[in-house]
Swiss-Prot record:
The lineage of its organism: Bacteria, Pseudomonadati, Pseudomonadota, Alphaproteobacteria, Hyphomicrobiales. The keyword NADP applies. This is 1,5-anhydro-D-fructose reductase. It comes from the Bacteria. Pfam families: GFO_IDH_MocA, GFO_IDH_MocA_C3. Keywords: NADP, Oxidoreductase. It is an enzyme of class 1 (oxidoreductase). It catalyses: 1,5-anhydro-D-mannitol + NADP(+) = 1,5-anhydro-D-fructose + NADPH + H(+). NADP(+) binds at residues 9-12, 33-34, 38, 71-76, 93-94, 120, 162-163, 283. GO terms for molecular function: 1,5-anhydro-D-fructose reductase (1,5-anhydro-D-mannitol-forming) activity; nucleotide binding. Monomer. Its EC number is 1.1.1.292.
Amino acid sequence: MIRWGLIGASTIAREWVIGAIRAAGGEVVSVMSSSAERGEAYAAENGIAKAVTSVDDLVGDPDVDAVYISTTNELHHGQALAAIRAGKHVLCEKPLAMNLNDGCEMVLKACEAGVVLGTNHHLRNAATHRAMREAIAAGRIGRPIAARVFHAVYLPPHLQGWRLDKPEAGGGVILDITVHDADTLRFVLNDDPIEAVAISHSAGMGKEGLEDGVMGVLRFRSGVIAQFHDAFTTKFAETGLEVHGTAGSLIGRNVMTQRPVGTVVLRNEEGESELPLDHRNLYETAIAAFHSAIGGNGRPSASGEDGVWSLATGLAVVKAAATGGAVEIETGL
């Protein structure tokens, strides 16, 4: 059994990850919050035996094998390195870090320590995206030439905090949502982005110069161009992912979501057909793969390197939106 410590008494851990760890046969043994009162209440609410107030206390606990980091973005790098130094496996929320040097250091140190580092890019675990990846690899749409991502959502009131008003914490829609688009596109297309252009704005939610909406285009190594629209402000939009090829199109609807839902339609000269899907909890799939990787079987659903790629893409989109120019995507890996 893999025993987990939570770095951050977060909403995502409470709503998704704690249950996924338990469903995958693991146990959550400790939670760290800088507030002792919050940590103790969170532990009691979620059936966790220990609550601590420092990262060192959590990663120094011999009962902890792996940590899940879901604090604000500027804390990820230091907390991950502390866990890696202590010999703990690390599953970290995106973005891995605030800059590429820190992200690459996390990957390097995990490799040197012989521990597993994963990025919690949940969307590549969706049955919809896996079916699209398989269909493309099988040649069912011919050569991919373009893609479109619709990932404009409404940020619920209980999450309308640092994402909207703390630039120093890595707030804004690009580092929160666009990084997911980048990872999903890399996974589905089995291709890497090399260039970004974008325009961002604030429609009233984003403060302190932070964007709450962005549209842009990524150019991939193969020549595919991918359009994306991300926002915190759209209450009634539908999410989706489309990939268009020389011999067909894949139309994914309601697929950019944490829930195991959505449909994928293959459209070609023969007509339309809905791809069969085996919907499963995305986070349970991710944790099961992470447990297997700890045991020496396979790799995490999204590795540390995958997290660096999505970070590099997000940072390029931020720069492109700020400068109005095309920005090359380089990872430093």
